[in-house]
Amino acid sequence: MKLFGVDVGGTFTDIIFSDTETRVTAIHKVPTTLDDPSTGVVQGILELCDRQYIDRTAIDHVFHGTTIATNAILEYDGAKTGMITTEGYRDIIHIGRHQRPQNYSIMQEIPWQDRPLVQRRHRLAIAERMGPVKGQVITPVQEDQVRGAVATLKERGVDSIIVNFLFSYTNPEHEQRVKEIIEEEYPEAFVTISSEVSPQFREFERFTTASINGFVGPKVKNYIQNLEQSLKDSGISAELHIMCSNGGVATPKTVSEKPVNTLLSGPAAGILGGAWAGELTNRQKLITFDVGGTSADIGIITDSGYGESSARDTWIAGYPVMVPMIDIHTIGAGGGSIAHIDEGGAFKVGPRSAGSRPGPACYGHGGLKPTVSDANVVLGRIDEHNFLGGEMKIYTNAAYKVIDELAGQLDLSRERTAEGVLQIMNNNMANAIREKTIQKGEDPREFSLVAFGGAGPLHAVEVAQILNIPEVIIPLYPGINSATGLLTTDLKYDVIKTEFMMSTNMDFSGLNEDLAGLETQLINQLKEDGVSKQDIRILRSADCRYAGQGYELRVDLPDVFLDEETIVDALNNFHESHKAEYGHNFTDSPIEFVNIRVTGTGYMPKIEKQAIHHEYQLEDALLKTGDATFNIDGSLVKVEINFYQREKIPVGAEFNGPCIVLQKDTTTVIPPNCTAYIEEYGNMIIKVGV
């Protein structure tokens, strides 16, 4: 099969092609067309088809990672929204949980109040009420009030209507009926009901999640429609699948209805790309390290795979989001991070970034602030003639100027200042990794660090040295790792049902019936998407807690009829998980089941392993020698090093640091006392010395 993976970033759109029959792989980058990213997507696919002589009509699948929803929420640039809610509860999404994001600040910035997803004047209440336990109707929905509310919102020019009713997770009947009325009265509106997006208890989080879906919905839906039409107009009839935050892909129809599931589309694909590098190199315990121009994304992969964020810890742009997401930790640290001295006189790097325009001073686009990239230029780690394969000029004098200005404020030399910028940057990223490993009971010394993104390989080895991580893996195509990850996943859907139940008083009949119903729902959806029964896999789990707790842990449920005997392993696993997470457990205390979950995956074709073969010798890869500065035993030393061209380094040949490896999509810095080699599938393995 002929597969394309396309990941859209803020600066570049990355494309990878894989033919599963011939095992041919090709990559391409084009500038992202910010006004309409679908233009760049189609342009990149067509250019790669022309270059590789690929018949565009023979493409089978296009897998796509998108930032449309992410950017809409980060930039607060979504639809004009309205909300219909239960009488007395229109301010749930404003009040929240009385959290103070900055405990001691007298100038609080509370996102759901400062940047409301639905303006208060567009939040209309109607009479209706469901019971909190069994979902019994207490107050029937007043349809005349609904029609009046819809007419009001339509008159006010609202594009998207969100329906958030109290206790709708117990019985969605009222929300579903209101959706029908909206579609009758205002068919042009984008409609979201909370019981379809996140049918879980916790009203503030559920209401907010549904509101995000409505806020980003019209923009995502229009984008997907444009992309589908553009592909069709270009003669590409391939099936399109969109990357979701849970680590799987979904159909355009599903994503158009629930775009909130794509908020971490790109970073999730990056985690999968890191896992693919681990599979190729037979490593199971991995720390993924994706560093771009603005941010660094950290992910953890263990023997059991990647983790999923806890519902209580999942926030996007300051808003709580209660949908399944891969556990990713993001900090403001990247190649464009600005070095500065704060009001208290502290030397800091980030989180502010120069972005792509004007960008770092060394880009020559008018940047006037010292950045991490400028520090790398000063220390000789970014080559002025071979950046982006020689396609982009680096202005070293501009980098010297901004670092010198910072050095004057610090009363340090140019090189010492640049080294200080990198030390702060590297320690910030090391601390982020500590949060995801040591603070979670994992020892980073037992992991390999998989580095990718434009800036990840520049810093990975020195970050690994800080944490005593013994090995760094640089994928074959680190700059398009997220696009590669798109070709390694499956269709994946999650369904959830809130169901409170104590382990001392289990309703096994109801539990088994509900699990069977959720499984049937998923199987039907996957079959509708064209997945055959033998390619469907179902996993069951539950969110549990000790009685009286306000947070849950997820445990797997066996794929058997549940009763007092078959549930024992799940209960024991909860005790073990609680001890691993918090350092203690209460084995004599009853366990409360809160939510039951079912995850369904449908097999999709994937990229195939392809060993690399060429006739080069290591000396053929030597591009030049030059000077670079490294911290050796506490002293800055300028040394002459080799600059290697990565695509010409032969498999198995070892080479020692200090040296720098150049390729079009990134630069890899290998400090002193480190050794590297290329394994059979093209991944660079760096053995880290201290």
From Swiss-Prot:
One of its GO terms (cellular component) is cytosol. The keyword Amino-acid biosynthesis applies. InterPro entries: ACX-like_C (IPR049517), ATPase_NBD (IPR043129), Hydant_A_N (IPR008040), Hydantoinase_A (IPR002821), Oxoprolinase-like (IPR045079). It comes from the Bacteria. Its EC number is 3.5.2.-. One of its GO terms (molecular function) is 5-oxoprolinase (ATP-hydrolyzing) activity. It is an enzyme of class 3 (hydrolase). Pfam families: Hydant_A_C (PF19278), Hydant_A_N (PF05378), Hydantoinase_A (PF01968). The keyword Amino-acid biosynthesis applies. Keywords: Amino-acid biosynthesis, Hydrolase, Plasmid. May form a complex with HyuB. PANTHER family: 5-OXOPROLINASE RELATED, HYPOTHETICAL 5-OXOPROLINASE (EUROFUNG)-RELATED. Involved in the asymmetric conversion of racemic 5-substituted hydantoins to the corresponding L-amino acids. HyuA and HyuB are both required for the conversion of D- and L-5-substituted hydantoins to corresponding N-carbamoyl-D- and N-carbamoyl-L-amino acids, respectively. This is Putative D-/L-hydantoinase subunit A. The gene is hyuA.
